Amino acid sequence: MRKTIYCLLSLTAMLSACVDYEDATKPLQQTTVRLVKPELFTDNSNLGNRTITLKADNKTLTAQTDANGVASISELTPDVYTISTAWSITSSEYSSITGGKGQALSSAHDLTVSGSLAKQEIFAEQTVDIQLSVSEDQDIVISKIYYATSKDENNKIYRAGQYLELFNQSDNSVDVAGLYIGLVEAEGIQAYTLENLHEQYADSVVLLKQIFRIPKDTICKMAPGGTLLIVNSAIDHTKNNAPMEHDLTGADFEAKDTSKNPLTNNPEVPALDLIYSYYSTISNMNLLTNGLCGVVLFQTDEDVTSWEKTYKYPNTATSGTQWVLLPKRYILDGVECLSNRADTGPDISKKRLYPEIDASCTHIVATTGYTGEVVYRKTSDKKSAGGHKLLVDTNNSANDFNVSKTISPREYDEVEE
């Protein structure tokens, strides 16, 4: 979810025994999770005494790695697990671990080492490898995405209250003028799978269906621990018989709707710049209620309007929908939202964002939306050096985000001290 220093994309599971579903309730004698260091790490010295978390349904287990980054787990109940790990290192530690070959992008920022495997079947004794990546912590993160929408008191779908929120993790005011917000390609049948992107673009780009920009001609400072609220309709939606919606009149920016049947816009709220939309008739944020709502933040001095566009894979069409190819190196933060499935949960194979941008995904509980659910970052149990609240950012949205029907804009969980 941050600017990536280096990562190998493959997350592999090495199975050492056959699956035996007939004995699926008997605890396994031995399961091993092995951390695989990023290529620039000179050895495994930073992989010892790290916490591995295994989640399945309503149970969570943890294990500690040995000096070589290997965790042995006894008496593990056979199940389908999400396995993850993450820890922080300083920029000087990163330089030391890489023998000076890896240079952090900013000495002011710490870095996060992380890795994740989703829906890993463990029904027999085996060794599971988790490929690690390293990413630089960012000042500004995506902290809320409200795409689900709701229904009003007449049981009619109410879409107007969708919004995004950003949060400043740093102890300094940050001028976000000129910051870009990208909405990721979200077709029912993917325009490009990650495998397609690997084949044609060597994992170097992300497909965007829309690009917006915070106006660059006016200073726009976010206070330490402050938020930025970006909406489609900056009105008080609670007055429209929509009890699960919010008062958005205090929004910082509004994506103005210029369609023939527009949402109500607020002339008192500044316009978000629209740079590109895959449909000329859609000028506001096209957040899909079904959950295919990947969002990225990126920064560049390049002329974004000149960037290459592509038709769906294998890009042989001459007309139709086109997506902008965003160079991955400019991405500061990214959150993968996927549709939920009642029986299996989100389908990780539908990911649009590389694991080094977001190792997993977040999602609402509902499978179709219209429930007033918002995905939002958890509050960390740590404070900033200046004493303000921090949000969890481990480069893994499955770990970093919660879901709520009641939390309000600019509001986050409080952690007891």
Where are these regions (language model features)?
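Bacterial Sec-dependent N-terminal signal peptides
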Residues: M1-T42, I130
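Short, ordered, surface-exposed loop/turn motifs in non-cytosolic proteins
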Residues: E39-N58, V174-G178
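Short, acidic Ser/Thr/Gly-rich low-complexity loop/linker segments typical of extracellular
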Residues: D57-A71
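A short, solvent-exposed beta-strand micro-motif common in secreted/extracellular proteins
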Residues: T77-S95
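Structured interaction patches on ligand/partner-binding surfaces of diverse proteins
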Residues: I89-Q131
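A structural motif detector for short, solvent-exposed N-terminal "entry" segments of globular domains
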Residues: S133-Q190, T281-G294, T300-T318, D381-K383, ...
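Solvent-exposed beta-edge/loop recognition patches
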Residues: A202-T406, E416
